[in-house]
Amino acid sequence: MMLEHVLVLSAYLFSIGIYGLITSRNLVRALMCLELILNAVNLNFVTFSDFFDSRQLKGNIFSIFVIAIAAAEAAIGPAIVSAIYRNRKSTRINQSNLLNK
């Protein structure tokens, strides 16, 4: 694939994720959009690593770190959402003001 095609795909994924984060009122949907943004960043890391310096694996190593962080977020995020739902009976972002009380 050409570099431009992959960058356009990554920009679309990133834009959809940002749009979802801005407009989402649901915590689960916001977590999914955050994962989409992280995947777009991973795609950029791997693409630039392959295109500019194919012998070194710096971009691939960065993407492995981002995948590890995303896995931790995917494990902890739903647990936090579940705890908020048990306390507030809602997963809406504007109703989760746990620090105010």
From Swiss-Prot:
The keyword Translocase applies. Disulfide bonds: none annotated. It is a multi-pass membrane protein. InterPro entries: NADH_UbQ_OxRdtase_chain4L/K, NUOK/Mnh_C1-like. The chain crosses the membrane at residues 2-22, 32-52, 61-81. Keywords: Chloroplast, Membrane, NAD, NADP, Plastid, Plastoquinone, Quinone, Thylakoid, Translocase, Transmembrane, Transmembrane helix, Transport. It comes from the Eukaryota. The keyword Plastid applies. GO terms for biological process: ATP synthesis coupled electron transport; photosynthesis, light reaction. It is found in: Plastid, Chloroplast thylakoid membrane. NDH shuttles electrons from NAD(P)H:plastoquinone, via FMN and iron-sulfur (Fe-S) centers, to quinones in the photosynthetic chain and possibly in a chloroplast respiratory chain. The immediate electron acceptor for the enzyme in this species is believed to be plastoquinone. Couples the redox reaction to proton translocation, and thus conserves the redox energy in a proton gradient. Belongs to the complex I subunit 4L family. This is NAD(P)H-quinone oxidoreductase subunit 4L, chloroplastic.
